[in-house]
């Protein structure tokens, strides 16, 4: 069986509020070498780590990230009360700069930075790239930008040394006739083709969301070894002895 490479999906999101510094640190402490985060822009153009299209699930607030200034967002708590009750009541939204500072201290970590479609649709590709790309100057070996928006990735690919990764929910959304090729392709496990077509592509294939050991073993048996998971600690522990996945 192949040795798996696990990517911490929004940090250790199974046990901590996703995309927060405590979730990212918990993933690193668990042994993660690869982490993935989501980026959106505040009303006053400050990049923050946040996944959802609205603030309700994670912060119990109305509206979307770009409805608020960064100072306003910092007054909200990222609690995910449905999952964690009030355990993390004082947990704050992290800025992208805080995450970059964290990566510079933990230079062994590799990060996938997802540029969210909502942000790109609202502010435009040009503005997003003008703000975000310079923040990662000198970190080209540590960072890969990913997105469902292939146009913005093509611009990154053509203007910088950063790796890129296309994200799709269905295999049919992956278009190979674009005149360029990303280094990575992220595909949902439900969207994988039934045949071995997924193994024939040039980009490295990463699959999400791999939430249990049985699924991880199934994908490994098919030759897919880059697995994105909310349960980074459990997965790393399960495959820590020769990649056998013997723990539950």
Regions found by a protein language model. Give the residues of each.
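Phosphate-group recognition and catalysis centered on beta-loop-alpha active-site segments
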Residues: 1-248
């Amino acid at each position: 069986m192949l040795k798996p490479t696990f990517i911490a999906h929004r940090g250790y999101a199974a046990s901590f509020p996703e995309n927060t510094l405590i979730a990212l640190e918990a993933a690193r402490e668990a042994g993660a070498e690869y982490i993935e985060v989501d980026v959106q822009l505040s009303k006053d153009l400050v990049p923050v780590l946040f996944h959802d299209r609205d603030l309700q699930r994670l912060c119990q607030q109305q509206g979307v990230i770009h409805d608020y200034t960064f100072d306003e967002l910092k007054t909200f708590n990222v609690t995910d009360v449905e999952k964690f009750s009030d355990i993390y009541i004082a947990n704050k939204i992290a800025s992208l700069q805080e995450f970059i500072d964290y990566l510079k201290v933990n230079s062994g970590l590799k990060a996938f930075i997802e540029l969210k479609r909502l942000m790109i649709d609202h502010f435009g590709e040009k503005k997003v790239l003008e703000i975000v790309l310079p923040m990662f100057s000198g970190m080209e070996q540590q960072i890969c930008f990913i997105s469902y928006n292939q146009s913005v990735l093509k611009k990154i690919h053509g203007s910088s040394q950063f790796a890129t990764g296309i994200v799709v929910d269905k295999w049919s959304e992956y278009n190979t006739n674009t005149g360029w090729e990303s280094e990575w392709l992220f595909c949902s496990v439900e969207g994988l083709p039934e045949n071995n077509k997924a193994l024939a592509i040039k980009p490295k294939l990463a699959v999400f969301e791999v939430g249990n050991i049985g699924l991880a073993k199934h994908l490994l048996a098919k030759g897919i070894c880059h697995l994105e998971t909310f349960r980074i600690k459990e997965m790393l522990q399960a495959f820590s002895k020769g990649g056998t996945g013997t723990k539950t």
